[in-house]
């Protein structure tokens, strides 16, 4: 994909990939279970709050990456 868009910085692509990856947190993720045990929450509570939080973090990071792409 990078050769098709030579104006896009490879660093921005890497940040965008990382930003999108944190939004896909599911119950098979080991950090999900670590957060569940550390917080003492039920499975439903952890799924609701942790998944929502990581999704919001991913969207904010992608928006920041988009803004950063204008600077770099």
From Swiss-Prot:
<protein>
    <recommendedName>
        <fullName>Putative D-serine transporter DsdX-like protein</fullName>
    </recommendedName>
</protein>
<dbReference type="GO" id="GO:0015128">
    <property type="term" value="F:gluconate transmembrane transporter activity"/>
</dbReference>
<dbReference type="Pfam" id="PF02447">
    <property type="entry name" value="GntP_permease"/>
</dbReference>
<dbReference type="GO" id="GO:0005886">
    <property type="term" value="C:plasma membrane"/>
</dbReference>
<dbReference type="InterPro" id="IPR003474">
    <property type="entry name" value="Glcn_transporter"/>
</dbReference>
